[in-house]
């Protein structure tokens, strides 16, 4: 008998970190909640990272997910922005890991492929597919929608990930 698995998807960002929580049972997906954790751009970097940490910790504590998935960082031409995003991503991975959750990572194109069928697509396509896959899904903005897409990507890939880990271990 299968158990429901609760997954939190996290789309890291220094200004806004999106989060989305879904329940999975077999191939079925159920929307639970989504939103964003924001940091105050007028504060110093360390304080902003603390805001992200505390906000995500509250979400993880409140929704009690079983597993987490975080989007990988892409490198752009602005090295400083990339480093700051990497620090926010570290928080996004640390919070669920400290709560004892396994944390998976997915490239942005893998997330898009899992949700819309191709690795390159527009935000509107993701929004549309989220509503098709989970008609009761509510999300305000791209960050929360992306986080739900990351959770769905993990739901589709978690079985393959477990098999891969078992093969490497044994």
Curated annotation (Swiss-Prot):
Family matches, as CDD domains: RuvC
Catalytic activity: Endonucleolytic cleavage at a junction such as a reciprocal single-stranded crossover between two homologous DNA duplexes (Holliday junction)
Keyword terms, alphabetized: Cytoplasm, DNA damage, DNA recombination, DNA repair, DNA-binding, Endonuclease, Hydrolase, Magnesium, Metal-binding, Nuclease
Subcellular location: Cytoplasm
Cofactor note: Binds 2 Mg(2+) ion per subunit.
PROSITE patterns the record matches: RUVC (PS01321)
Positions annotated to bind Mg(2+) 1: 11, 143
Subunit structure: Homodimer which binds Holliday junction (HJ) DNA. The HJ becomes 2-fold symmetrical on binding to RuvC with unstacked arms; it has a different conformation from HJ DNA in complex with RuvA. In the full resolvosome a probable DNA-RuvA(4)-RuvB(12)-RuvC(2) complex forms which resolves the HJ.
Protein family per UniProt: Belongs to the RuvC family.
Cited function: The RuvA-RuvB-RuvC complex processes Holliday junction (HJ) DNA during genetic recombination and DNA repair. Endonuclease that resolves HJ intermediates. Cleaves cruciform DNA by making single-stranded nicks across the HJ at symmetrical positions within the homologous arms, yielding a 5'-phosphate and a 3'-hydroxyl group; requires a central core of homology in the junction. The consensus cleavage sequence is 5'-(A/T)TT(C/G)-3'. Cleavage occurs on the 3'-side of the TT dinucleotide at the point of strand exchange.
Protein name per UniProt: Crossover junction endodeoxyribonuclease RuvC
Source organism of the structure: Rhizobium rhizogenes (strain K84 / ATCC BAA-868)
